Amino acid sequence: MNWHMIISGLIVVVIKVVGMTFFLLYFPQVFGKSNDGFVPTESYGTTSVQNVSQIFGRNDESTMPTRSYGTVCPRNWDFHQGKCFFFSFSESPWKDSMDYCATQGSTLAIVNTPEKLKYLQDIAGIENYFIGLVRQPGEKKWRWINNSVFNGNVTNQDQNFDCVTIGLTKTYDAASCEVSYRWICEMNAK
């Protein structure tokens, strides 16, 4: 048997497998935006951008279909369990972050379930993001911006910080409201 031919054949097969793997991994990222006007949904086939404009009575691209049939989030917002979330790339103090969310018809995120906290922290990664949890200066109780009481634990709360971030440490962390961080806005999906 000619071992040189067998080894050459195996090398060609390995190169083809590696090449096909890279092709399958990166082809959708490079050529994923098609001009056919359809965005795949999670389990209901496709929803056309034209149908989205019919729902809202306008023909712009400021809203895009999400992965849940019949719901729409603004462009650059993420859909999760009936809500739309915006993760900022810029940083601002807490008040400016809250004001930005208000201009978008939303609020800072109210993270009132462990599942929602995990989802937001997974996306936040190593960055810290303001959420809608604060306490009035001099008070001990933390409240969500919808005025509901928070019953969990906040780290660093003894440092006289009155706002909260999530992200890097996977906990609720007290933070100065005057320091600039990224922020998460939340609204109901339409």
Swiss-Prot record:
Its main location: membrane. Residues 80-186 form the C-type lectin domain. Gene3D superfamilies: Mannose-Binding Protein A, subunit A (3.10.100.10). Residues 26-190 are extracellular. Glycans are attached at residues 51, 146, 153. Induction: By TNF in bone-marrow derived macrophage colony-stimulating factor-dependent macrophages. Up-regulated during the differentiation of myeloid cell line 32Dcl3 into neutrophils. Disulfide bonds join 101-185, 163-177. Disruption phenotype: Mutants are viable, are born in the expected Mendelian ratios and have similar numbers of myeloid and lymphoid cell subsets as wild-type animals. Inhibition of autoimmune joint inflammation and preservation of bone density. The chain crosses the membrane at residues 5-25. Strong expression in bone marrow cells and thioglycollate-induced neutrophils (at protein level). Expressed on granulocytes and monocytes from bone marrow and peripheral blood. Expressed in macrophage cell line J-774, but not in T-cell lines, B-cell lines, or mast cell lines. InterPro entries: C-type_lectin-like (IPR001304), C-type_lectin-like/link_sf (IPR016186), CLEC5A (IPR052869), CTDL_fold (IPR016187), NKR-like_CTLD (IPR033992). Keywords: Cell membrane, Disulfide bond, Glycoprotein, Immunity, Innate immunity, Lectin, Membrane, Signal-anchor, Transmembrane, Transmembrane helix. GO terms for biological process: innate immune response; myeloid cell differentiation; negative regulation of apoptotic process; negative regulation of myeloid cell apoptotic process; osteoblast development; positive regulation of cytokine production. N-glycosylated. Contains sialic acid residues. The keyword Disulfide bond applies. It is found in: Cell membrane. Acts as a key regulator of synovial injury and bone erosion during autoimmune joint inflammation when its activation leads to enhanced recruitment of inflammatory macrophages and neutrophils to the joints. Functions as a positive regulator of osteoclastogenesis. Cell surface receptor that signals via TYROBP. Regulates inflammatory responses. It is linked to Involved in the pathogenetic mechanisms of Japanese encephalitis virus (JEV) infection of the brain. JEV infection of young mice results in increased expression of CLEC5A in spleen and brain with consequent activation of proinflammatory cytokine secretion. Monomer. Homodimer. The majority of CLEC5A is expressed as a monomeric form on macrophages. Interacts with TYROBP/DAP12. The interaction with TYROBP is required for CLEC5 cell surface expression. Interacts with HCST/DAP10. Forms a CLEC5A/TYROBP/HCST trimolecular complex depending almost solely on TYROBP. This is C-type lectin domain family 5 member A. The lineage of its organism: Eukaryota, Metazoa, Chordata, Craniata, Vertebrata. The gene is Clec5a.
